[in-house]
A protein has these predicted regions:
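Residues lining hydrophobic/aromatic ligand-binding pockets adjacent to catalytic sites
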Residues: 1-188
Length: 188
């Protein structure tokens, strides 16, 4: 694994194996981005910062997006580092809970990447991985994203938007609702 359970002895081999496997998709124009999703337990500490830098270097031939689930990573130094490397900072929509990333529409690369995880605050820390992401966005919640998406789209050459999907399948309905709002705003 490259982001969740990293083995210091094998991560580089894992990254090279991943790169070899994904290269044909990139060469065929079928790979929009590689998302590196780091869990809440990935802290802004020297060892983790060093690892992130090495991993981004190993995968630098790919269009990269980095998703941090820990607010510690949302400082000016990290943002500038991502811009210098032309790596997208994944904007995440999550519950507004202590320690989680802030709502952000920062664009750090030609690619902008947004993930909607839902705002199920009651199950975020106590639920399992399925119930944590069960969430049906209201039209108002999604509508508030339209100006953000417009601004991101104006700054980036490509905007990717994803919804986290689990047992109830809310992602498809949420995506359709956002698509309707985006079309009404002439964004899509």
């Amino acid at each position: 694994a490259l982001t969740h359970k990293v083995d210091p002895a094998t991560w580089k081999d894992d990254a090279l194996e991943f790169a070899r496997g994904a290269a044909p998709l990139l060469e065929a124009g079928r790979l929009a981005a590689v998302l590196l999703e780091f869990p809440f337990s990935f802290h802004y500490k020297e060892e983790e910062r060093r690892y992130l830098g090495r991993l981004l270097g190993e995968l630098s031939s790919f269009p990269l997006a980095v998703e941090f689930r820990n607010a510690e990573w949302y400082g000016a130094r990290v943002i500038e580092g991502l811009k210098e490397r032309r790596v997208a900072l994944c904007s995440v929509d999550l519950p507004r809970l202590e320690g989680l990333p802030p709502l952000s529409d920062l664009v750090t690369a030609e690619l902008a990447y947004v993930r909607f995880h839902g705002r199920n605050a009651a199950a975020w820390w106590t639920g399992d991985s399925g119930s944590r992401y069960e969430y049906r966005y209201s039209p108002e919640e999604l509508g508030a994203w339209i100006p953000r998406l417009e601004a991101m789209s104006a700054e980036a050459s490509k905007l990717l938007v994803f919804f986290n999907n689990h047992r109830r399948g809310d992602a498809a309905d949420n995506a359709r609702a956002l698509s309707r709002l985006a079309k009404a705003a002439r964004l899509a």
